[in-house]
Amino acid sequence: MSEVVNKRHFDAFNGDADGICALIQLRRADPKESILVTGVKRDINLLKRIDSKAGEAVTALDIAFEKNSADAARILESGASIFYVDHHNPGDIPEHDALEAHINTAPDTCTSLIVDRLLNGQYRAWAVTAAFGDNLTEVAQSLAQQSGYSAEETELLQKLGVCINYNGYGSSLDDLFYHPAELYQLMDAFDTPFDFVDALPEVFETLANGYATDMASASALAPIRKTETAATFMLPDEQWARRVSGVYGNDLANKSPARAHAVITEKADGAYQVSVRAPLTNKSGADELVKQFPTGGGRKGAAGINVLPKDQLDAFIEAFEAQYS
C-alpha cells in the first residue's frame, strides 16, 4: 500500500494562459494530487526539474518537446510515464510505450484547445479563455459563439485570457503579480472562469489594473524602425516592460494585422529579450526567424528569443525585416 501512496504525479505546465487553462481542464476532469512544476512563460525547460522514479507519472503542457527531449528521455528511462500536450515544433518525438503525445503545430490551435478536444468540450470556457490569451481571437470568438456564450461573457473570457497571459511574462517570478502555480490553484477550484471571477474578483482586478497601467506605458513608445510590413519596438529594462513584452506584441498585431512586429526588451546585463509576432494575415515564419539565434524558439505566428547578445541586435533587425519584406 505504501508503494502506491509514494507514486508521485508531476504537472509541468507553461506559466501562461494556455498552460494554466490546459491544466485546469485536465484536473477538473481528472483530479490528482500533484507536484506543480512551472515558472515564467519563457521558462520552458521544466522537465529538467523533475526527478522521477519507476511507476510515477508526468503531465507536460504547453512546453516545446524539442526543448525538453533529453529530460523526457531521462524520465522515460526512469520508468515513469509522460502525457504530453503541446502546439510548438516538437522536433523528433520518440516511440515509447510510456509516452502519450498529443502535439499539433497548426497556427490556429493551442494546448488548451487540444485538451478541449480530448475532453469533448467538457470545460470549454477555460479553453476559450486560453485561446484568447494566445491571441487566437477569431478561433476563440467562433468557439464562444458555438458554445452559446453571450457577447458580455465572451468579452469577459477575452479580458481574463489576456490578463492571465500577461501575468506570465517577466524575466523572473519577481516581475509577476502572481506565481503561475498560485494563479492556477486559485482558478482550479472553479468549473468555469465566470465562477472564478464572481468568487475572486480582486484577483482579476489586480491583473486587469496592472495590464492597463503597463500597456499605457508601452503605448507611449514609438517604433525604433518601421516599414510597410514590419515594425520594431524597444522597451526599457523595467518591470512593467518585462511584464508587457508579449501582450504588447499581440496588441500591436491586432491593431496592424498585415504587419509583423518585434518587441525588444533591454536586459540588465546589456543583452535583449525579443518577442516576434507574424502578421495575423500570414501567421508564418516567426519560428524560422528566431531559430537563426541560439535561444530562439516558438510557433509560426508567435516566437521569441530569450537572450539576444547586444552585438547581434542589428543582425536580428535585418533578418526580421527580410523575413517580412
Please report, for each region that a protein language model flagged, where it lies by residue.
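Short N-terminal helix-initiation segments at or just after the protein's N-terminus
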Residues: 2-3, 168-180, 199-212, 243-250
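Alpha-helical structural elements
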Residues: 8, 161-164, 199, 206
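Oxyanion-binding "anion nests"
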Residues: 102-106, 186-233
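Loop-centered beta-sheet repeat module
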Residues: 144-191
